[in-house]
Swiss-Prot record:
Organism of origin: Human papillomavirus 36
One Pfam family here: Late_protein_L1
Protein's name according to its UniProt entry: Major capsid protein L1
Localization per Swiss-Prot or TrEMBL: Virion; Host nucleus
Similarity comment: family membership: Belongs to the papillomaviridae L1 protein family.
Length: 516
């Protein structure tokens, strides 16, 4: 018999004060028909693929680490459009509006041929292959081997006006009442940090701080054994209320398990057996071997694969092709606040490592009679080549109270850059100014000079690219500009000395009837 009961749960009331709504930039940004093309130089970097090379004292960095598995984070600096000497001053009213940039398209160019890179460790913790074992595994004091493999294949780029947010797992601080012994596994936690230029990407071993959590220094390859592998925190960036960190992104990852190994060393977490709770777990996970058998002493269960990125093909490339931004995933639809843009790139499909051999002894190569390996020094180098092109649209921000209130809550420094800060009334309109302030006859100058504007990303490492003098209105003179004009049926016109883009319609011819 069904009986109705009143709800016993809590009654939730709406908040007494309304929650501030964040507007999309499309609701208050006014776009113009003026477009600029920006492009960088050919960006090159050369280094060692696995580690930094220092001199014998350790004070001088001789060769930096440059790996195809690293993140490249480009910080593009754009000119301030409010300081432009526009030929047509009717474009905007400086008393009521401010100009900003909007990204409408970009192309990330990549040089160098496709290639598969190899990484590894000369003392890799690989006890034995567990996929096709023909005898029971016995461990010794040191079972490390010289092992190499190819990393997971990854192509990815993330575009925004703030740095990309990454995530990784790191050692956590345990509770005081549960303070553990240093010999036991520490607790771990997920940490969120900015991805900087040079941070390693995941190559198949996860996004982990290997420096803190793998003290054997033999569980992963050389290029990440002393590093932290980061992965973009797409969940956090997609739910960002302003959407500045990620306008859009493109990603392609692939891998498969090529080899299956087992770790050597003492097992930290034993398989539950008869020793627990007076035999409750006896024969629950395994049945012990007989006396005299190798299986009497159970082996290690620390299984892991080494992955492979498999085929590298030009048919699945994200680079050297244009991308157009019509609608961003967040509230910021491509507006480049503070006149800067961040592009985070990972591409290990061009991961070839050069091998360079140099004759070690005095004399010429023609004087060598017999080959001896000790006569030659072997070096490794990796190179990266980039080129970035942008299509920028000039936009206007109305200086209205509700718009300025949201911008102030988002980033108050923007209003200071626009010279809209509050200016207090001076107490005394007459100030003292000395002529020879540095001479011995006058007092010392102020000990606290005016403080310069501090970089909000001070201390973070980026690849700075200055585009302040790399803008052009002649879109048809550049490859990406022509693609932008043609793909939407646009044409470029000049009005009052200012070049703008207008729509050019296409008319289809009348289809002729086929004769019967």
């Amino acid at each position: 018999m069904a009986v109705w009961h009143s709800a016993n749960g809590k009654v939730y009331l709406p908040p007494s004060t309304p929650v501030a709504r964040v507007q999309s930039t499309d609701e208050y940004i006014q776009r113009t028909n003026i477009y600029y093309h920006a492009f960088s130089d050919r960006l090159l970097t050369v280094g060692h693929p696995y580690f930094n090379v220092y001199d014998i004292t350790g004070n001088k960095l001789e060769v930096p680490k440059v790996s195809g598995n690293q993140h490249r984070v480009f910080r593009l600096k754009l000119p301030d459009p409010n300081r432009f000497a526009l030929a047509d001053m009717s474009v905007y009213n400086p008393d009521k509006e401010r100009l900003v940039w909007s990204c409408r398209g970009l192309e990330i160019g990549r040089g160098q041929p496709l290639g598969v890179g190899s990484t590894g460790h000369p003392l890799f913790n690989k006890l034995k292959d567990t996929e096709n074992s023909n005898s029971y595994i016995k461990s010794s004091k040191d079972d490390r081997q010289d092992t190499s493999f190819d990393p997971k294949q990854i192509q990815m780029f993330i575009v925004g006006c703030t740095p990309c947010i990454g995530e990784h797992w790191d050692k956590a601080i345990p509770c005081e009442k549960e303070r553990q012994d240093n010999r036991l596994c520490p607790p771990i936690e997920l940490k969120t940090t900015y991805i900087e230029d040079g941070d390693m990407a995941d190559i198949g071993f996860g996004n982990l701080n290997f420096k803190n959590l793998q003290e054997s220094r033999s569980d992963v390859s050389l290029d990440i054994v002393n590093e932290t592998c980061k992965y973009p925190d797409f969940l956090k960036m997609q739910n960002d209320v302003y959407g500045d960190a990620c306008f859009f992104y493109a990603r392609r990852e692939q891998c498969y398990a090529r080899h299956f190994f087992v770790r050597g060393g003492k097992t930290g977490d034993d398989i539950p057996d008869a020793r627990i709770d007076n035999g409750t777990f006896k024969n629950q996970f395994f049945i012990p071997g007989a006396d005299g058998q190798d299986q009497k002493t159970i082996g290690n269960a620390m299984y892991y694969p080494t992955v492979s990125g498999s085929l590298v093909s030009s048919d699945a490339q994200l680079f050297n092709r244009p991308f157009w931004l019509q609608r961003a995933q967040g509230h910021n639809n491509g507006i480049l606040w503070a006149n800067q843009m961040f592009i985070t790139v990972v591409d290990n499909t061009r991961n070839t490592n050069f091998s360079i051999s140099i004759y070690n002894n005095n004399g010429a190569l023609k004087d060598i009679n017999d080959y001896t390996a000790e006569q030659f020094r072997e070096y490794q180098r990796h190179v990266e080549e980039y080129e970035i092109s942008l299509i920028l649209q000039l936009c206007k921000v109305p200086l209205k109270a509700e718009v300025l209130a949201q911008i102030n809550a988002m980033n108050s420094s923007l209003l200071e850059d626009w010279q809209l800060g509050f200016v207090p009334t001076p107490d005394n309109p007459i100030q003292d100014t000395y002529r020879y302030i540095d001479s011995l006859a006058t007092r010392c100058p102020d000990k606290t000079p005016p403080k310069e504007k501090e970089d909000p990303y001070k201390g973070l490492k980026f690849w700075d690219v200055d585009l302040t003098e790399r803008l052009s209105l002649d879109l048809d003179q550049y490859s990406l500009g022509r693609k932008f004009l043609f793909q939407a049926g646009l044409q470029q016109t000049t009005v009052s000395g200012t070049k703008s883009v207008s729509y050019r319609g296409f008319t289809r011819g009348t289809k002729r009837k086929r004769k019967q």
